């Protein structure tokens, strides 16, 4: 009897343990399923958050672009309201010779003959004229590198207020990249407020229609072709800048966007020009490197430009500057020594140089230059 009771008790315990085991297994399975579902929900949530973040970043970038564009438009309108944007029609009416000179471009570029009046886009300017010196700086986008702010700071800060009043600095943005144009305008209006307000600092750009598509180096495959196109465009950029500056001042000084003007440079230039006894000079070199630091009489600029335009495809502009002497100074069959002697008399060199070249990264993509002494 007692044995049966023990067996029954064991059976009941076994059944209870089995039931508990089944229940535990069921609960564990259910919990695992819930954990799996929870994990899936977490992963899905993470994916949604990642997608949302990417979308937010994209929207933020788009909003920043729109905001920058709005800031540029606001700045432009403020300049307009402050009478800081020169009116092209007024300028052309006062300077018909300028209009006629720009019209000469149609002779060299047939694709311009269908266009109306040819004139740079004046972004910042008061149409300042009647000064002694115009200083021209052509700038293009160099990617992650820019020397323009450093250049302008040295150029304008090393003038006295009276010298600043008797001069105008012209920045030509010779780049089709609108973002670069906006960045230059923003930097100048923020950093050089006094010069902008007084009209002593101007910003102009080249209309898109001015250069034909053949000058777009992006469409050229060979590196040599791209370099040739870059040099051609550089000559044309300088020509536009010279023509624009011609009616503004008595003298024109050519600079570049990657140089530093030395202390008292402007005083030294004005003193040197004022003390030249002979008036028979062609131009004065305040730098020996390239086209930097060349001072011209503004009345001669049109003749230089026409010569450059005749041979703009053949050589860089500083080489063309040498060639013009062979045409203007040397007679056919003349002894070279006599020609060089006359050349020194009308091509005056100032030493030491008043400008230091600092740009390592050239405006030509992936080209570096380390020539410093100018």
Swiss-Prot record:
Q: Spell out the GO cellular component terms annotated for this protein, sorted alphabetically and separated by semicolons.
A: endoplasmic reticulum; endoplasmic reticulum membrane; endoplasmic reticulum-Golgi intermediate compartment; Golgi membrane; Golgi stack
Cite the entry's keywords alphabetically: Differentiation, Endoplasmic reticulum, Glycoprotein, Golgi apparatus, Membrane, Signal-anchor, Spermatogenesis, Transmembrane, Transmembrane helix
Q: Where are the transmembrane segments?
A: 6-26
Write down the glycosylated positions. Answer: 54, 95, 144, 275
Record-linked InterPro entries: Glyco_transf_54
Write out the tissue specificity statement of the associated record: Expressed in testis. Poorly expressed in testis biopsies from men with impaired spermatogenesis.
Q: Which residues lie on this side of the membrane: Cytoplasmic?
A: 1-5
Task: Extract the GO molecular function terms from the UniProt entry.
Answer: acetylglucosaminyltransferase activity
Where in the cell? Golgi apparatus membrane; Endoplasmic reticulum membrane
Q: Which residues lie on this side of the membrane: Lumenal?
A: 27-374
Which biological process annotations from GO are given for this protein? cell differentiation; negative regulation of protein glycosylation; protein N-linked glycosylation; spermatogenesis
From the record, give the cysteines joined by S-S bonds. Answer: none
UniProt name for this protein = Alpha-1,3-mannosyl-glycoprotein 4-beta-N-acetylglucosaminyltransferase-like protein MGAT4D
Which organism is this protein's natural source?
Homo sapiens (Human)
Name of the encoding gene: MGAT4D
